[in-house]
Amino acid sequence: SEKTDTLLFLGQDARTKAPTYAIEAIELLQKAGVKFTVLENEPNSGWVYDTLVGATDETKEVMKKAVETLNAYKTVIALDPVDAKTFLREYKEWGLGLKAKVETFTSVAAGLLKKLKPKKSEHKLSFQDPAQLARDLEETEPAREILNACGENCEMLLHGKDTMFGGNLLMNEYMPDTMAKVAADRWVNFEATDAQTLVCASPSEYEVLKMHKPAGKKIVTVAGLLLDACK
């Protein structure tokens, strides 16, 4: 898309395995009048390399290439929490020279609530905290501002920093049975609340939890929730 000062960094999962997640995020920012760029050939953040092999020279080379692209922008909105965590923590700790301001998609979306003016309903919602946001970046409030603006927030027993893993697309490729059990356990937690809809901020967790969704329950993305509330 056209070059602006702001890059929406979709991330590997949203680009290749969770396109709905990417499309809804783009639609929401457009609806709010945000001027931003999406790259046709987005660099790899290096998160997968760091997860699989750690802080190797290869991992750092991948990240350095990403920095060259990211530094062409003043602001980078990281749609996927794994990328946000990698940009804000590993890039900084390893001195990779990232100068662009990095913001999480959830914090940006919460900041747009006054402009979007979602209609609050009595619908009961529960949020799946991604560990990268809640633990690594200590971000828990923006998502709750969004849920409370759209409906009634019903917390699961294990939430915030105590969040429970909801699944992972990379791990689902080589241990699908384990991921099925992980997702099923999280749905059990969800069903212990009064909520009707589970709201996700991670493309990876969204897709795995959706694969194992119990009948009669609903799952949406943060952007999808807001788009529905703004109709």
Regions found by a protein language model. Name each.
Residues S1-K231:
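Iron-sulfur cluster-binding electron-transfer modules in prokaryotic oxidoreductases
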